[in-house]
Amino acid sequence: MLEKIDHIGIAVRNLDEAIARYTSLCGRGPDHLEEVASQKVKIAMFDVGESRVELLMATAPDSPIAKFIAKRSEGMHHICFKVPNLEEALSRLSTAGMEIIPGAGGKGASGSRVAFVHPKSLPGVMVELVEYA
């Protein structure tokens, strides 16, 4: 079961420039900054109502974000849904025939656990599932 849209992830080349632009858009700076070594990204989170906008910058050339930008340029990378139990959600989606990207259950931002559903499974949209501790 999906609890809510947790955030929308946007891939950027330069985090400082993107932060400046989103600060202008939101009228204030980011609510959270973090480097997530396991995902090879630096992130900035802007709270927007009950959801958030996550800016993601690659920290390594083999990062999924670096590969995304090389192939598609900057822009929307994924939509993330909060789930109460990641294993149950993944089991349900696998049973439904959806392709889970390897590395499911890995460490995400703020101590969360995350998994990604391949965009081939959901008409061109990468979906992230997040479970908070």
PLM feature spans:
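Vicinal oxygen chelate
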Residues: I5-R13, A44-D47, E54, A66-A133
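Hydrophobic side chains in well-ordered alpha-helices
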Residues: A18-R21, A89-L93
